[in-house]
Amino acid sequence: MTTCRRERPILTLLWILMATAGCLADLNEVPQVTVQPMSTVQKLGGTVILGCVVEPPWMNVTWRFNGKELNGSDDALGVFITRGTLVIAALNNHTVGRYQCVARMPAGAVASVPATVTLANLQDFKLDVQHVIEVDEGNTAVIACHLPESHPKAQVRYSVKQEWLEASRDNYLIMPSGNLQIVNASQEDEGMYKCAAYNPVTQEVKTSGSGDRLRVRRSTAEAARIIYPLEAQTVIVTKGQSLILECVASGIPPPRVTWAKDGSSIAAYNKTRFLLSNLLIDTTSEEDSGTYRCMASNGVGDPGAAVILYNVQVFEPPEVTVELSQLVIPWGQSAKLTCEVRGNPPPSVLWLRNAVPLTSSQRLRLSRRALRVVSVGPEDEGVYQCMAENAVGSAHAVVQLRTARPDTTLRPGRDTKPIAATPPMPPSRPSRPDQMLREQPGLVKPPTSSVQPTSLKCPGEEQVAPAEAPIILSSPRTSKTDSYELVWRPRHEGSSRTPILYYVVKHRKVTNSSDDWTISGIPANQHRLTLTRLDPGSLYEVEMAAYNCAGEGQTAMVTFRTGRRPKPEIVASKEQQIQRDDPGASLQSSSQPDHGRLSPPEAPDRPTISTASETSVYVTWIPRGNGGFPIQSFRVEYKKLKKVGDWILATSAIPPSRLSVEITGLEKGISYKFRVRALNMLGESEPSAPSRPYVVSGYSGRVYERPVAGPYITFTDAVNETTIMLKWMYIPASNNNTPIHGFYIYYRPTDSDNDSDYKKDMVEGDRYWHSISHLQPETSYDIKMQCFNEGGESEFSNVMICETKARKFSGQPGRPPPLTLAPPQPPPLETMERPVGTGAMVARASDLPYLIVGVVLGSIVLIIVTFIPFCLWRAWSKQKHTTDLGFPRSALLSSSCQYTMVPLEGLPGHQANGQPYLGGVSGRACVSRVHGSRGCPAATVGCPGRKPQQHCPGELAQQREDTNSQLRQPIVSNGYDLQNQQVARGPQCASGVGAFLYTLPDDSTHQLLQPQDCCHLQKQPVTTCQTAVRRTSESPGLESSWDPPYHSGPRCCLGLVPVEEVDSSDSCQVGGGDWSSQHPSGTYTGQERGMRFSPSPSVHVSFETPPPTI
């Protein structure tokens, strides 16, 4: 019993000693986060739980929210912390952001990768009009649904025949993209289709405002055409996910669809299979990136006409490893940590020491993906973290740095070994890299150069500043497909500064981040390097620095693209390749774009920063996809690293042709990061990855020198017979951001070998297009360019050859051909080959108002020109009608029959053959003689040139025979029905004097006037008092019409209507008095010779006759 009691204290002491030893061992252990918090999307008011597991487990765990420490639970914020668990009771706008857990122990601290908490939401559908979709019967129809913005991604539903379809069924196939494919469409599938978006977190459902109407048509034969997609597509997929490339074709007979990848048949790839005509790729990997071609053919038309291309990019989450050059660093020496990062797109990198972000300083030098600590001291001990993040995930790796006194020997323990990197953490959605301070991607290995000196001590141990960045002279483009000539020079050549010992040049392919940097050491006296074994049509980045006795100097950077190698099946022209690189120079399709399939631009590549002046820098970037609409502008934002705050707008409204801008007004000694956004008419892109930190060091004395690299002509186009339009691009970084004043454009006929034949146009400012006019028709021209400033001109650009259009003749001799513009032609697909130097006219949105105004004005002028002849005709018709009313058919009267009526006043009665003449009681009167020509009487009305003969009463006795033939009394019908007219016979003349009344026929007689070929005069005695009176009941306004007796026989050519003769015995009884009251009064409207008849008020003329003699 006593022995047992003595053994218990001993066992307890041993246990305490073992626990203490374990704790002491754990004190030197590197902390790790074994379970990272996961990004979450939650609805407003929902509960969010974030977990964090650390090793060793007894470590203290704290949390950060948007970079700020959370001191335990915050009731006001609604955040509760229990060791490794953070709970948000009710999510709101104030608790949305980025969270990190931090594990602390005496050896140091480590932070987890950030977890993003996002508020779920579902936006409304954009307003759209109804679309009519036509498809041939038996083919596949595609109904596209343009889902609104949603977090997380919305699920699509379709209204089909009054029923909502949530999953594929029957011949209805819902694709991952949200499109509805109707297989083997028939007449029964016609109708209206609408789609709806469903958010699985908020459980909201929103329906599109307009639907699409499907029409199924029947055709006899139609060539194959691809109805979806309508243009080349760029698809981004995360590694390990499945991918479906849609390709739907239509035609009669139904076409056959084939696929190819990078010019080779898709049959060689085992991971692909077909879903109808769509291509399905299981478990994508990096090797699945490339260009896929879908081709449809049915034997009708051109077999290669229906082609569409997909550009597939496989994104990979980051993979990080960190290395320490020396495990234990004596005080006063330098330590170098290298972080190797892989991922696509290239991840951004952030360095931390004991969970605190690091910035560049005199002792801490952040260069690419390396961290160098100069003159290590005890304060530099701790846990160093390399954290990488891109759009599809994040990862980090840690290493512990230990220091020792110079005279102390310390064996490295297990804690000095690098810690394996954590697996990549995929975000719940593409993360926002701008919300975390990071360093730009770069993989740095110690330079391995044969010219590297053995000692970097400066003579006299004087303090020397690092070498300045060299000036890169090479153009960012090369026509070579597998090599690139890199040319540079020292910034201050021949100066008394510390001499450069050697250069280190690194290059790597941007689109393939898994490749390591290729590093080359170049002697100080060599300023040229040829980079070989490059891939055609690929984007590369180059970083180089000069080394002097102070170590590595400032870095100069350039990005270039190699030339494309033509392929027999898939060929992309240089112009269209440039268009993909420079969305600002993109061609617009002549067809109306489908706005539903368009989107804001893609985020540009990470910008590079170079020194401009003491307080300014140049920010340079490379754009990506434009989302279907040309990029309208860029904007640059910056952020100070040592201050907490949001990103600040530095400048905006940067033209799409400019890929570099100077940012001024920076503070000395402050570290900045920059990012770029692209904007088109549909909105702005996501921000680019932030640049690496830039410290304003106060460099001054910059000299603006002559530009070396010239612009690059992207395409040319013949507008008409005498004009050629060209566009170009210019990257200031190719001339080390040297400012320029403008451009010189040189052109000459291609068949000329004399350089003096070049003509020069000058373009000033930031304009990147020009029209060369006054050229010769159907002539080929060589075109090249230079940029210039006060220092001189640059080297010549590439030479483009373009031929003007031929002059078109109308085919009529002696008439010059009309000036016509060539009709605009739709540009081909981006990836189809076209000879360099040709292109379609660039359609600009600013031309639309002028086009509308021109159409409206043209229509107005056309209407006016059309109505002027009509109005003139109407006026002429009215004038002619008015003239006819005054004298009907006067122009039709024959010249062979003319007459003149002159009133006889006071003519005494005379007789011929026992019949009295017309006469009067007093006065003198002259009567016009009726002239006859070959049996046809003449009238002065028809031929006013002939003067009538006048006779006085004394002469009438000798003209009895003529008078008898003239005083015949026909009655003019004047267009009225003669059968319905009553002949009024005058009573016996009481006074022996009768009145004879006469009036011309009105315009109704036009219908009865007919020309006659011959007229005959007949001598016939008439009674002087014979008259005819007509009354018409239908026309009460017309009281009477009287016609003097001219001649008898058939109607003459003078155009008078038939007359009616009345016997003398029945016509009138003569007396000594006047006419009875039953006589209607007649009117006579007439004018003198040479005047026209008009419908003026009637002039009453009376003829008195003596009583007849018995």
From Swiss-Prot:
Bilayer disposition of the protein: Single-pass type I membrane protein
Chief place of localization: membrane
Region (Disordered): 407-458, 561-610, 809-828, 1065-1110
Induction / repression: Up-regulated during early stages of myoblast differentiation.
N-terminal signal peptide: 1-25
Biased amino acid composition, Pro residues: 421-430, 814-828
Disulphide bridges, residue numbers: 52-101, 145-195, 247-294, 339-386
List of glycosylated residues: 60, 71, 93, 184, 270, 512, 720, 754
Composition bias, Polar residues: 1075-1086
PROSITE patterns: FN3, IG_LIKE
UniProt key word Transmembrane helix: yes
Tissue spec. comment: Highly expressed in embryonic somites, limb buds, dermomyotomes and in the neural tube.
Keyword field: Cell adhesion, Disulfide bond, Glycoprotein, Immunoglobulin domain, Membrane, Repeat, Signal, Transmembrane, Transmembrane helix
Pfam families per UniProt: fn3, I-set, Ig_3, ISET-FN3_linker
GO cellular component: axon; cell surface; growth cone; neuronal cell body; plasma membrane
Keyword Glycoprotein: yes
Chain ranges of the Fibronectin type-III domain: 469-566, 603-698, 707-807
Segments in the Extracellular topological domain: 26-850
Subcellular location, record wording: Membrane
Membrane-spanning residues: 851-871
Cytoplasmic face residues: 872-1110
InterPro entries: FN3_dom (IPR003961), FN3_sf (IPR036116), Ig-like_dom (IPR007110), Ig-like_dom_sf (IPR036179), Ig-like_fold (IPR013783), Ig_I-set (IPR013098), Ig_sub (IPR003599), Ig_sub2 (IPR003598)
Domain Ig-like C2-type, chain residue ranges per copy: 31-118, 124-208, 229-310, 318-402
GO terms for biological process, alphabetical: axon guidance; cell projection organization; cell-cell adhesion; positive regulation of myoblast differentiation; regulation of striated muscle tissue development; smoothened signaling pathway
Assembly, per entry: Part of a complex that contains BOC, CDON, NEO1, cadherins and CTNNB1. Interacts with SHH, DHH and IHH. Interacts with NTN3. Interacts with CDH2 and CTNNB1. Interacts with CDH15 only during the early stages of myoblast differentiation.
Name recorded for this polypeptide: Brother of CDO
Biological source species: Mus musculus (Mouse)
